[in-house]
Amino acid sequence: MATIFSRIVAGEIPCYKVAEDDKFFAFLDINPMVKGHTLVIPKQEVDYIFDLSDNDLAAMQVFAKKVALAIGKAFPCKKVGQAVLGLEVPHAHIHLIPMQSEADMLFSNPKLKLSPDEFTEIASKISAAM
């Protein structure tokens, strides 16, 4: 059975897309910790990020870097943090989170509640910065 992320890539489930190439896809986290919180995934359905081939893992990091630089332009911050957890969705993914402090990376923090219009605006700002 396809993961929710594979279904997003296939267009079966809507998302707020930020960027895409032939191997990778970036979209906003629907339960963001801060504005600009983005997920980067391989289009190939792989549960554990370290099960990706060396080439695909390296390429995913290069893609994530492009997205992170755009996030930093769209949402000025001290740094864009990166986290790989992968326990909730069995599909490898990288969280990219604009940070003003390390506290912005605490996944136990309350999540933002944003409207569809806010999500659309955020995704557009990041895409435009790419």
Predicted regions and their residues:
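HIT superfamily nucleotide-processing domains
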Residues: M1-M130
